Amino acid sequence: MWDSSYMQQVSEGLMTGKVPIDQVFGTNPLEKLYKRRKPKGTVGLQCSPCLISKSTSTDDIVWDQLIVKKTLADLLIPINRQMSDIQSTLSEMTTKVHEIERQLHDITPVVKMGKTLEAISKGMSEMLAKYDHLVISTGRTTAPAAAFDAYLNEHGVPPPQPAIFKDLGVAQQAYSQKTMVKNQTTDAADKMSKVLELSEETFSKPNLSAKDLALLLFTHLPGNNTPFHILAQVLSKIAYKSGKSGAFLDAFHQILSEGENAQAALTRLSRTFDAFLGAVPPVIKVKNFQTVPRPCQKSLRAVPPNPTIDKGWVCVYSSEQGETRALKI
């Protein structure tokens, strides 16, 4: 029979936990419910002892982030400063480049005038060379000493025109102890004293240096580095060594006055002038025959047994390999 008091005791025991459920029902009626709510194979997360010992609080993580941000900021500050300096330098360089471009644009016309300036310079050099030998080219002056002294006594200064003569009254007047002479007159006397050694025979035929004589001959020759330029140099050197450079130049001008050109005059003199008869052409050492002036390369021939200048052999080129070629006109 149903005993209400017993059931009350059982209920109180179950509620208080003094009486186990298995003792009353034999099996736990909630066991199936537990198994249904808790799937098979589900295992709770477990932390390793090493991880549990570490601090994983939010404050530590935030602090680490702040430290990283501060470090990055300290690194970026000098980088930003350097970038600013680089930008400033680039700006200055850009300005300078623009200024250089403007200057180059301004000097471009000057660069284009290079050929013109070179031609003017060459013309001026030739003109100065001719001016230095003006007396030689034009012959003797005819200004008498009396006219020079008369002009000096009247005006007190030498005349502007050149006056070269043997009897120099102005020289005696300049070095006189009793006469007060101006500086211009003294300078004129010093310059004229340099030609006192010239005589009537040697005045129009002075002994020029080989270089000056060759430069005078070049003014009559067309082109550059032609065989006739080499011939002019060789003849000038031989004439200078023999002391007949003045006579050679006088003979050259004489042939030109007859209507011949400079090439014909040099060829004629090389075969008729006494200083060149039987003269042996000089030997010029070169690295190879390609270094010989291009206009002369077509005139190179095999060296004959006894070459002489009066037979048209100008010079002999000797290469480093031991080969020889003669320049023939």
From Swiss-Prot:
- Give yes or no: UniProt keyword Transcription: yes
Spell out the InterPro entries in the cross-references: Filo_VP35, VP35_IID, VP35_IID_b-sht, VP35_IID_hlx
A Pfam cross-reference name: Filo_VP35
Recorded GO cellular component terms are: host cell cytoplasm; virion component
Question: Domain VP35 IID spans what residues?
Answer: 204-329
Coiled-coil annotated residue ranges, if any: 70-120
Compartment(s) where it occurs, according to its Swiss-Prot or TrEMBL record: Virion; Host cytoplasm
Where it mainly occurs, coarsely classed, is: virion
Q: Which UniProt keywords apply?
A: Coiled coil, Host cytoplasm, Transcription, Viral RNA replication, Virion
Q: How does it assemble?
A: Homooligomer. Homomultimerization via the coiled coil domain is a prerequisite for binding to L. Found in a trimeric complex in which VP35 bridges L and the nucleoprotein. Interacts with NP. Disrupts innate immune signaling in infected host cell.
Sequence similarity:
Belongs to the filoviridae polymerase cofactor VP35 family.
Entry function: Plays an essential role in viral RNA synthesis and also a role in suppressing innate immune signaling.
Q: Can you name this protein?
A: Polymerase cofactor VP35
Q: Give the organism the record lists.
A: Lake Victoria marburgvirus (strain Ravn-87) (MARV)
